[in-house]
Structure formats: structure tokens, C-alpha cells
UniProtKB/Swiss-Prot annotation:
One Gene Ontology biological process: lipopolysaccharide biosynthetic process
Pfam families in UniProt: Glycos_transf_2, WsaF_C
Name of protein: O-antigen biosynthesis protein RfbC
Keywords: Lipopolysaccharide biosynthesis
CDD domains in UniProt: GT2_RfbC_Mx_like, GT4_PimA-like, GT_2_like_c
Gene that specifies this protein: rfbC
This protein's record includes keyword Transit peptide: no
Signal peptide residues on this chain, from the entry's feature table: none
Protein purpose: Involved in O-antigen biosynthesis.
């Protein structure tokens, strides 16, 4: 992924999409979580990773398409609360769809202002309802049961009538009055019409108010009452459903339906949120409707045919495909349709063997003869004997010349691109030995129906049903290897062949297109097809022989026609450890344990009941009642982490098999554990789940589809159990999946341990799916058996909002390989991902796009990006607070011992060793340069050996620091040490003086046990670096520890000592006279103004300076030239192109020359720190314009060596005008400025500090003038 991003910058590949950025975010979040808590040696790395996370998150949000789906019904309702955010989808109709869509859009968009007014009261009700539902959801989650029904109803009832219109306008008085008049006229003229349209919505509103009244009461409604309220609002959620508008309005009903489309979706999500609040379920959904399946096909297949035709045209090799069709008394019309479908194939390299299998119908011979005469690729054979379809088919196969052989029924048809898709698939995957396609049914009128969209190769599904069915295409040599069809398996020949093929090869492909159309109720199948009973018996025999050939001892039965159950034997009686985590809910726990002990027939098991932070007395009383020796009671009282609880419990378990089971289950099938054990013992199987049902008999779990709902979902969820009709079959078949839910899953211990158990980075959701994905990656199957079931007492409404955000990101990273266009191999890309009913896919998004929309819009970090970043920064700070800490006793000891330590040093009369605590640095910036310059002069002039301790970056190399400093102050460096851990400060050698150089280092100096005097080299007032809060307070505390201060500038000394009463000395900074001097070159031309502009540093007043300079340039034009430097920024982006020239970052040696080429220098200093910038410009004879800062008055005197300005645009502009227009003023100020700076030298300042420290001369503080504001002396 990272290589892809790198390649983009070089133009090698297409730019990353939203899915790629989401993957980057997911991986970065995972890496950051792995670095919690932050270790000192990883601090810089973690900061860099957080910066990368911010960048990737910004790219993700910029790349997102509009739309999305909320994580929970309540979030989705909030997103849909504005009913007037119209969006009309394209019609699904194949004919006339464009016209219908245009009419709807014309009606909705053309009258949009009036529709907005019409729906405004309803929008107000929607927003109020969301607020109430949010409040009640939080209220109940906290366990509060006070009666808030009066408040809740008062929020909703006054807004419940959607036709109480009050028209206003945001426009001016005249225009607003006209617009308001038009809207009022529309509403009142059409009032009766609109009331009829909104009557159904009004009833829904009132029903919802009554439901909220019940939900907000002191007593929770009972189950029956809760279901009744949910059913009431559910029945009314479609505003126009079941209603016919009066009179002439009927013809416009579909148009009004589009106006209310979004409101209908809001109603549906609100009903789910209400059901969740009441702890009940909505009414079960119906199996998906397939009424529009022909139109669905017509809208999609022409493009597929064209694409296949174009792909075939590009082929350099076209293999020959042989079709074999036994013909016996087929309908003339249907046979001609079959012939026409093959003749119209867009792939031309085929042959067709039509085998006349003793037909008696007089038209058959004529049709077959005509077909062969008309088409040379058709050959007609006569079967050698009568009445055996398998033998006739094999005779056709024996005559084939093609590379691949396919089987086609005489009355069935193929899509025009069927053979093209087959050829393309075999050429794209030359390892394939065979493939099959999706299919549908064909009635007598030629209408397509009953589609069956199949999964990819699923061996356990094939043992439940012949799901491959029609249009199996096999490599000829593979078919010869297994001997073709076998006689004696009437009605199950295809199933038997597929089972034998699966024994010969695992290279089985699947084309996910309905290319085969099987005739329903044909004459041929009725006259010659085996009856269901015969076919079922043949299928049982085929499966039994297959298992015997595979060396598997198992019993095959048939629970329903042409459906099978393979009952694998339990080998021995291995012990099963059933692991049940729980927190209270004694009612659920009693149901589970009592039913498990009473119902389970399997004899050898233990139940590990793992309490996680249970607190209710009833729970503990229940546990005390149970004395069955099979019950093992454990406690895991740590913060909830579902995979961690189960991993820990698995280590306590003694069984060979581990069964993870939710506490809200109920056992109803005595053989449930026998079935799970028998499946789990199969060596090719990694994990086994089973069917879970809600108490009312609908499906809660029958497998997991990765990509459904964007992450992972349960197909058939809440559909009735049994052989219901969906395009994906039903839940009566045992299937393979990528995963099953850990609510009930069994694994062999050695398999579980070889995987390392569940991934504990997950907390609540996703670890079970991720485990299944790892099992599949290792070549082990995941099975969901349909042969047993449990009752799952889980809430049936969505609770995705209860899932930690980290689980979403971890899930995305794990699931992504199966989220794209191909999707989950055990599902089908033509089936819906936005619902769980396995209906037709009518949405364009794949699983990745759905997931990315959730991640980019609906998870907490997406809804509050700044809050997420703030949380990460604050968490980082919290993890380091231990290093920035002292007790009151430690602070008091430091303050009380400071005078004695200072007196002892002064009595000694010299400083022999100093230890400086400095932060790690990459380049030598001004503050660092001052520290090492000071140390260098202390050594050369006063004999002080200085050692340096890098305290904040454990991974830095001492040699790197030495090399960086040696270039500027070769005599400054003594020993350089790096603190690998905070406690390593105790190992430092003794020193006369230990100096902190930043507030973070003051805590290390405090804990230095062998420091003589503790000092503080103060170059800024660091609390002002932060907003008032924790960092600011932590910084401020360091000035009250009794350290001896050495202050950079008298102004900073005055400020800090005035606030905190520190004792210490100050020094004036000097400049490097070789770089900064007043020997200015002669220059002519416009007055040149320099501005130190850094947009990313707020204390430099970038906006204020840029505004004043741009205006100055506009006023004076070519008479003035404005230059800026200090950072890279684009003048065009700030609207000053042509007014200001930005030179960007300049090396130090270049800045002095630049200053001497400028006449006026503008800079600002809004904090208490000393700035070297005015010093350097003054040393070069520049007229400095800056703000009046009290801490800089030791240097700056208005009208004498600078111009001080009030920090407003006009104030700064006035001083700039004075400086630019008055050359004599500039000359005088520049000369005085250079002279003032030249008075100071580093040598003298170091001597001053040492005298003050050792009390060998006048205290520096005594020489400070109590200067009045120099602004008071202006003019």
C-alpha cells in the first residue's frame, strides 16, 4: 500500500482511492495502538505516526463520495432527518425507465422550493424526535428509570402535525415578501391536496409520540406492549402505503412518493431505533421480491454481452468448446429456442453434439437434421441404446473434439455471451479444470425467473445439495479421467459427476453470471426425468460412495427431496470445554445453563462460566446454587475485551475441543453438541458454527458474509427458518463460509492454539471474523451446519453504535481483501450488501465502498476529526505525566535546600562541573546555539567542564550530538550522555551545577540525586506556549522549585521573577559580528521592506504584518519593495501575489547580507521570549518596526533605535509609512540601533552571569532600569 502511494508521486500508477486511504488509516491506527502506552524511546516515532495518521485521514475525507450509511439506526435517522434533501434514483425499468426518472425529477426538482416549505414542519418533528431518542438511549444505557415522559412528549406533540405551515424567507424585505407570498399561495391553495398526501405521515408521527410516551416512563413497557408500539409505527412507516389519494391525485401518487422517499427512510430507521430503545424487535422482513428480475437483467446484461464480445475480439487464441445435449421428445418450440440461443453466441469457436436419445416425437428428427444442415458446427448422433440419459451423454462426450466440454439441456437456453465468458475464464485461469455458472429459470413464455446466484466452490454445500446444477463445463482430459457420467444415478447424474470431479481436482472455477436458463416444467423432464424420490435415493447413493472413496465413514440421509445430511460419527468422546463469558444478567445465564445441562445428550463436557465485572447479588446467588461438577466458575475482572476473556478462559480449560458460547443462548436440540463435535473432528475443518434462531423462529445466524453492511453481516437475518425462496437458497443447507459468529463456534484446541487464539486488539466485535479469515488462509474450512440450532436471545435491532471505533478500523484492515468487487467467495457479487435478505443487488457500491463511507463519515473520529486528534494528543500527554511529576514533599525539599546549595557553591568560589539537560536536536537552532555558546565560554573563561544529558530521546547517539556541536563550539562539549529511561537519572555523576534548559528537563534535574546546585537556563516563558491547561500548569510549576535562574534578557528576568520570585541572573544576547554588522553596500532604487513571515507560528503575527504590508504596497506602488523570508509559503494563496515576494527559508550566512540590503524590517514578538531577529536587523543598521512588548524594553526605545507600533493594521501601517517616507529618520534609527547592539558581547555577558552566580561582583539585577513604556515618550 505504501509503495502504491510512493509510485503515485512518480506517475507510475493511478492515485490511491478512498479504500486505499482507509487502509492506510486502519494500519496506522493499529500500529499506534500497539505502541500504547508510549515508551520514551518510541515517542518521536509515535509523533511521526500520528502526523501520518492525520495526513492519511485528511486524504480519506477528501476522497470520499457523498452519501454513506450510519453505524446505527439512530445515527442514520439523524442523517436523514431533513426530508427535503431530495435525491431521485434512476428507474429500474428496462423500458421507459429514463422517461419515468425524468418525470419524477422534473416534479421534485422543478417544484423544490414549494416541497421544501411543505416538508418544513415534518423536518422540525424529525429533528426533535432524533434528539429525544438520543436522550432516552443514553438515559436508559446509564440505568436511569426516572419518568421523563412529560418532557419527551412536550418536545414532540406540538410538532406532530406536518401541515402547520409558517412561511418565512431569508431574503431581503421586498424579495422575501414576494417569495413568501408565492409559497403561502401554493400551500394554502393546495392545502387539501397536501393534507391528503401527508395524512399517513401525520398518523405515523402521532403513533411515534405514543410509543415515546411509553418508552420514557418510569417503568419499562413489557415485551408485549413494546412489540405493539413498534408494530404500530412499523405499519405506518410508508406515508403513502396502503392508501389511495383521492380523485385526480391518484395519477400523481408515484411522484409524491418520490417527494416522501427520504422521509420514508427516516421513518424506517427511527422504528429500528425505537425497537432498540425498547429492547424488542421489529416485524420480521419478508423474503426478497423477485418480481422485477427480468427488468433487473435487462438493465445489466447488454453491457456484459458487449464487454465479452470486445474481449473475445482481442484474443490471440480461441479454444474449442464442445456442447453435449441428449435429446428425447423435447418440445419443438423449446428446442428451437435452445438452438437459437447457441447459434447467437458471440463466441464462435464451438461445436455441438446433439444426441437423439430414442425420441418418439415426429418433429425431432426433422429439427435436428435441419439444424445440422444449417450449421456445420452442429453434429447429430443417435444413441446406441434407448432410455439412458447418462449413456447418451457419454456417447456425445466421446465424439467431442473440443478442449472443454459443457452440458446443455435440450429445452434450456444460454445467454448470448455464455460461451465467451467460459472461454475467457479458462484462458485467464489456465489452472482451472472445470467451472460452473449462475443460472435462472425459464417459463413456457420465455420469461426468466427464480435466479440462483451461487457461491464459489463450497465442498460442504455440495454434500448438502447439488448446488452446481446446470452448465458445468469441464476440461476434456479431466472429464475423461473420471469417466464421464455414470449410469444408474437417474436424477442425480450431475451431482454424482460433480462429486467425482471434486475428488480429481480442486481447481474449480465459478462465473458469477446467470448464463444458463433452465426450462421449468418441460415436457422432456416430465416424461423422461426421474421422480424426486428416485433422484433423492440416487443422490444418497452418490454421496455415500463419494464419502467411501474419500475414506470418510459417515451416514447420508435425506431430510427433504434432493437435499442431504451427512452425519459424521463422533470419534471417541473427546472432552468439550464450553466457555461462557458473562456480566450479570442472571436471567439469561439461568436459561442457558439449565437448558444446556438438561438437554445436552453428549456426555463429556465442562462449562466454564467466566464472570467479567459482575456486581449483582442475584448473579452470585445463582452461581452459589449450582453445584454440578461440570460447571467451572471463573472470574476475569478486567476491562471488557471479548477475545481476551476467551483466550484466558481457553488456557484454563481442559478439553480437547473448545466451544465459545454466548450467555444469551438456549439449548433446544439434544444432539446439538454431537453434531458440532462430529464436524469439528474432521481434519480439513477449522471451525464449526450452527444455525441460531431468535425466539420467534427467525434466523439470527446461518453464517457470516464479509462485506455485508460494509463490514460483515449475517445472511438470511430475521428471515423465517426453513426452505424459503431467495436467490441464494436457504438456511437448510450446510455451507462453507469465511467465518461464523463466535456466539457459538467450536474448534479443536490444537487449531485454536496454532493460530494464537482470538486477536486481542479487537475489543467487542470482529475477532471472530478475523479468526475465520486466518483459518481460510491456512487452508482450513469454516462450516456452518444446518443440522442443529440454538435459540439466541439477542436484541434484533442494530447496535453497531455500541462497538468501539477501533474494532471498525481493525476489521477493515483484516476484511479488505474480501471487500472489493469480487467480494466474499462464499456469497455472490450480484446479491445485496446493504440488506441481509440475500436479495438482488440494486446498489452500485461494493463492500469496500460501504465500509469506507462508514469509516469516513459515521465513526466518532469522522464526526469529530479535531476531537479525535485532541484525544490522541491528550492520551499521549497522559502516558508521559509520570515523567513530569513530583510530590509536594519533593518540591518543598528542593525549595528549602536551594539557599544552602547556593551558599555552598559560593563558598567554594568556583564551578568545576556543570551538567546541562538538553532536548535532542537535529540542527543547531538559536536556543541550542546559545546554550552551547554559553558552555563554551564558561569553559574557556572560567574553567567549567560542561557535560550534556539528552533526556527526551533514548535512541539518539551521543556521537551525533557531539558532531553537530563541534562545528560551532568545539570546546563546549564534555561528556554527552543519553537517558534511556527516566530512572537512569539516578546513575548520573555528581556535578556542581545541574541546569534545566526547558520545562520538561526541569523534572529530570529535580530528581538528579547528586546535583550540587540546581539551575534553570531560561530562554522563554514556556507556559505561554500552551493554552491554559495541563501542559501550561506543568510548565509553570517548574519555576517554583527553588532553582537558580539564568535568564536570557533582562525583560524575561523581570517577568519570571516578578511572577515566581526566583533568584538568578540575566544576560543580554549578542550577535555574531562577522555575519551581522552595519557595513551596508550602497544601493539605489525603491525603499526595501523586509518581513519575517512564518504562517505556521502564530506568535510572529503573520496575518497582521501581511495585511499592513499589502496595503503599504498598494499605496506606494513602485516606491516600495516588500520581501519576506522565514518559511515557505505561496503569496498567491494569500492574495498578495505581485505585492510581496517570499524568499522562503534562508541560511544564516545569507540573512545578514539580506538585512543590509533592506531599509526597514518588520517583525513581531507577542510572547515573553527573547527574539534574535530585531537584534540581528539592528546590528545591520535596519530600521526595525515592531510591537511594544514590555519584556523587550531593555533593548528597544521608540524613536531612538526603532519604531514601536500598536498591534493593529492601522497602527503598524502608520509606523511603516513613517519609516518608508523619511530617509533621515531611517538613517538616525539605523545608526543608533547598530550602536546599541554593539555594546553587548557574549564574553562580557557570560562573565556577568558567573559573577552573579558566585557573588563575586554586583548582582546583575541591580543594574536594571525601571523603564517606562517607550510609547509614552513618542511624539
Amino acid at each position: 500500500m505504501w509503495q502504491k502511494w510512493a509510485d503515485v508521486t512518480q506517475g507510475h500508477v493511478a492515485a490511491p482511492g478512498p479504500g486505499d486511504f482507509a487502509q492506510m488509516v486502519a494500519v496506522l491506527r493499529k500500529v499506534l495502538e500497539e505502541r500504547q502506552p508510549c515508551a520514551p524511546e518510541q515517542c518521536d516515532e509515535r509523533s511521526a505516526l500520528e502526523g501520518a495518521l492525520r495526513l492519511a485521514t485528511e486524504h480519506l475525507h477528501r476522497a470520499l463520495p457523498d452519501g454513506g450509511q450510519g453505524m446505527s439506526s439512530l445515527q442514520e435517522a439523524a442523517r436523514l432527518a431533513d426530508p427535503a434533501a431530495f435525491s431521485i434514483p434512476a428507474s429500474h425499468r428496462a423500458r421507459g425507465g429514463t422517461l419515468v426518472t425524468s418525470a419524477k425529477r422534473a416534479f421534485v426538482n422543478g417544484l423544490e422550493p414549494f416541497h421544501v416549505e411543505m416538508l418544513r414542519p415534518q423536518g422540525n418533528f424529525n429533528r426533535a424526535l432524533v434528539r429525544v431518542l438520543e436522550y432516552l438511549t443514553v438515559h436508559r444505557a446509564l440505568g436511569l428509570r426516572d419518568d421523563v415522559s412529560s418532557w419527551a412528549v412536550a418536545q414532540l406533540e406540538p410538532l406532530a402535525v406536518p401541515t402547520r405551515w409558517v412561511v418565512g424567507s431569508h431574503r431581503g424585505r421586498v424579495a422575501g415578501a414576494l417569495v413568501g407570498f408565492a409559497k403561502r399561495g401554493y400551500l394554502y391553495t393546495l392545502g387539501p391536496v397536501l393534507e391528503a398526501v401527508l395524512q399517513g405521515q401525520a398518523r405515523w408521527n402521532l403513533a411515534m409520540v405514543e410509543a415515546i410516551r411509553a418508552a420514557a416512563g418510569a417503568q419499562a413497557p413489557g415485551e408485549a406492549e413494546a412489540r405493539r408500539h413498534v408494530a404500530d409505527v412499523e405499519a405506518l412507516r410508508e406515508p403513502l402505503a396502503g392508501r389511495t389519494l383521492p380523485g385526480a391525485l391518484r395519477v400523481t401518487q408515484p411522484l409524491w412518493g418520490e417527494v416522501l422517499r427520504r422521509q420514508s427512510r427516516f421513518n424506517a430507521e427511527s422504528v429500528l431505533a425505537l425497537a432498540n430503545l425498547l429492547g424488542t424487535r421489529t416485524a420480521p422482513p419478508q423474503p426478497p421480491s423477485l418480481a422485477d428480475y427480468p427488468a433487473w437483467c435487462a438493465a445489466r446484461e447488454p453491457a456484459r454481452v458487449t464487454a465479452a464480445q470486445e474481449a473475445v475480439a482481442r484474443l490471440s487464441r480461441r479454444p474449442l468448446i464442445s456442447l453435449v445435449t441428449p435429446v428425447h421428445d423435447a418440445s419443438e418450440a423449446f428446442l428451437r429456442e435452445c438452438l437459437a440461443s447457441v447459434s447467437s453466441q458471440v463466441y464462435a469457436d464451438w461445436e455441438w453434439l446433439l444426441v437423439d436419445d430414442a425420441s418418439t416425437a415426429p418433429h425431432l428428427a426433422r429439427i435436428l437434421r435441419e439444424a445440422a444442415e444449417r450449421e456445420s458446427r452442429i453434429r447429430v448422433l443417435t444413441a446406441s441404446s434407448e432410455g439412458d440419459t447418462a449413456r447418451a451423454t457419454n456417447e456425445g462426450f466421446a465424439a467431442c473434439r473440443g478442449d472443454f466440454v459443457g452440458f446443455l439441456g435440450a429445452e434450456d437456453t444460454l445467454s448470448p455471451h455464455a460461451l465467451a465468458e467460459v472461454a475467457l475464464a479458462f484462458l485467464a485461469q489456465p489452472e482451472l479444470a472445470l467451472l460452473y455458472t449462475d443460472e435462472d429459470g425459464l417459463d413456457a413464455q420465455g420469461h426468466r425467473s427464480a435466479p440462483f446466484f451461487k457461491p464459489d466452490w463450497s465442498p460442504d454445500l455440495l454434500r448438502s445439495v447439488d448446488y452446481v446444477r446446470h452448465f458445468l463445463v469441464v476440461r476434456r482430459e479431466t472429464l475423461a479421467q473420471v469417466g464421464g457420467l455414470r449410469e444408474g444415478f437417474d436424477g442425480a447424474q450431475g451431482h454424482d459427476l460433480m462429486l467425482r470431479l471434486s475428488e480429481a481436482t480442486s481447481s474449480i472455477g465459478h462465473i458469477t453470471e446467470p448464463l444458463y436458463h433452465a426450462r421449468e416444467g418441460s415436457a422432456a423432464s416430465a416424461s423422461r426425468g426421474a421422480g424426486l424420490d428416485t433422484a433423492t435415493k440416487a443422490g444418497v447413493r452418490a454421496l455415500s460412495e463419494h464419502l467411501a472413496r474419500q475414506g470418510e465413514s459417515a451416514e447420508v440421509t435425506s431430510p427433504a427431496p434432493i437435499q442431504y445430511r451427512v452425519r459424521y460419527p463422533v470419534r471417541g468422546t473427546p472432552k468439550v470445554s464450553i466457555i461462557v463469558p458473562f456480566k450479570d444478567r442472571p436471567d439469561l445465564l439461568r436459561t442457558l445453563v439449565d437448558s444446556l445441562l438438561a438437554q445436552t445428550r453428549y456426555p463429556h463436557f465442562e462449562v466454564l462460566l467466566v464472570s467479567n465485572n459482575s456486581t449483582r447479588p442475584e448473579t452470585f446467588a445463582l452461581l452459589e446454587q449450582w453445584v454440578d461438577p461440570r460447571l467451572v466458575k471463573l472470574t476475569w475482572d478486567h476491562p471488557f475485551n471479548y477475545p481476551a476473556i476467551n483466550n484466558w478462559a481457553a488456557k484454563q480449560a481442559s478439553g480437547e475441543l473448545l466451544l465459545f458460547l454466548n450467555n444469551d443462548m438456549e439449548v433446544v436440540d439434544p444432539s446439538w453438541l454431537d453434531e458440532l463435535v462430529s464436524q469439528a473432528q474432521r481434519p480439513e475443518v477449522g471451525a464449526v458454527g450452527c444455525k441460531l434462531l431468535f425466539p420467534e423462529g427467525t434466523v439470527q445466524h446461518a453464517g457470516v458474509v464479509v462485506g455485508m453492511t460494509g463490514f460483515a453481516g449475517h445472511p438470511f437475518w430475521r428471515l423465517p427458518e426453513g426452505p424459503i425462496s431467495t436467490p441464494f437458497g436457504h438456511t437448510e443447507w450446510t455451507r462453507n463460509w469465511l467465518s461464523v459468529t463466535s456466539a457459538c463456534v467450536i474448534l479443536r484446541r490444537e487449531v485454536f492454539e496454532s493460530l494464537g487464539g482470538f486477536d486481542e486488539r479487537f475489543q467487542v466485535c470482529g475477532s471472530d471474523v478475523e479468526l475465520g479469515l486466518r483459518l481460510n488462509a491456512q487452508g482450513l474450512r469454516v462450516v456452518c451446519t444446518a443440522q442443529t440450532r440454538l435459540i439466541h436471545h439477542e436484541s434484533a435491532s442494530r447496535r453497531a453504535d455500541a462497538i468501539p471505533e477501533a474494532d471498525y478500523w481493525l476489521s477493515y484492515a483484516a476484511y479488505r481483501p474480501w471487500l472489493g468487487p469480487k467480494g466474499d467467495p462464499y456469497y455472490n457479487p450480484h446479491l445485496t450488501l446493504t440488506a441481509t435478505d440475500c436479495g438482488l443487488r440494486r446498489h452500485p457500491e461494493d463492500g469496500e465502498q460501504l465500509a469506507v463511507r462508514t469509516l469516513g463519515r459515521d465513526v466518532p473520529s469522522a464526526r469529530d476529526v479535531r476531537g479525535e486528534q485532541r484525544a490522541r494528543a491528550q492520551r499521549h500527554l497522559i502516558e508521559h505525566l509520570e515523567a513530569w511529576d513530583f510530590t509536594p514533599e519533593q518540591a518543598q525539599t528542593s525549595r528549602e535546600s536551594a539557599p544552602a546549595a547556593l551558599a555552598a557553591l559560593r563558598a567554594k568560589g568556583r564551578v568545576e562541573t556543570a551538567t546541562w539537560f538538553v532536548p535532542a536536536f537535529g540542527h543547531v537552532y538559536a536556543g541550542i546555539h546559545t546554550i552551547f555558546r554559553f558552555a563554551d565560554l564558561m569553559q574557556r573563561r572560567h574553567g567549567v567542564r560542561s557535560d550534556f544529558v539528552i533526556y527526551d530521546q533514548p535512541n539518539v547517539r551521543p556521537g551525533d550530538i557531539e558532531a553537530r556541536v563541534a562545528a560551532i563550539c568545539p570546546g563546549a562539549v564534555g561528556a554527552v550522555r543519553v537517558l534511556r529511561r527516566p530512572e537512569d537519572v539516578a546513575l548520573l555523576p555528581a556535578c556542581d551545577l545541574a541546569l534545566a534548559t526547558a520545562w520538561t528537563s526541569a523534572y529530570r534535574v529535580l530528581h538528579h540525586p547528586r546535583a550540587g546546585l540546581r539551575g534553570y537556563f531560561v530562554q522563554d516563558y514556556e507556559p505561554l506556549f500552551h493554552a491554559a491547561g495541563t501542559p501550561s500548569a506543568l510548565a509553570e510549576q517548574t519555576y517554583g522549585l527553588g532553582f537558580y535562574g539564568i535568564f536570557n534578557t533582562p525583560g524575561l528576568y523581570e517577568h519570571v521573577v516578578g511572577l515566581h520570585g526566583m533568584e538568578g541572573a540575566w544576560f543580554e544576547p549578542a550577535v555574531d559580528g562577522t555575519l551581522f554588522h552595519p557595513r551596508r553596500p550602497p544601493r539605489q532604487g525603491p525603499v526595501r521592506v523586509f518581513f519575517y513571515g512564518r504562517p505556521g507560528n502564530e506568535r510572529n503575527g503573520f496575518e497582521l504584518g501581511l495585511a499592513a504590508l499589502a496595503q503599504l504596497k498598494r499605496e506606494l506602488g513602485p516606491a516600495v519593495e516588500v520581501l519576506a523570508a522565514g518559511a515557505e509559503w505561496d503569496p498567491e494563496a494569500y492574495g498578495v501575489r505581485g505585492l510581496v515576494t517570499n524568499l522562503g527559508m534562508l541560511p544564516a550566512e545569507r540573512t545578514g547580507a539580506l538585512y543590509r540590503e533592506c531599509d526597514v524590517g518588520l517583525c513581531f514578538m507577542f510572547t515573553r521570549h527573547p527574539s534574535y531577529l530585531p537584534l540581528e536587523m539592528m546590528a545591520c543598521g535596519v530600521t526595525v518596526v515592531t510591537n511594544d512588548n514590555p519584556t523587550n524594553r531593555w533593548l528597544l526605545t521608540h524613536g531612538e533605535n526603532c519604531l514601536l507600533a500598536e498591534p493593529t493594521p492601522s497602527g503598524v501601517l502608520a509606523r511603516l509609512r513613517d519609516a518608508v517616507s523619511n530617509g533621515a529618520l531611517r538613517a538616525r534609527l539605523g545608526t543608533n540601533a547598530a550602536e546599541r547592539v554593539s555594546r553587548t558581547s557574549w564574553e562580557a555577558e557570560v562573565d556577568r552571569v558567573m559573577k552573579g552566580l558566585l557573588n563575586t561582583g554586583a548582582h546583575p539585577a541591580a543594574t536594571l532600569d525601571d523603564r517606562a513604556s517607550s510609547l509614552e515618550h513618542a511624539s
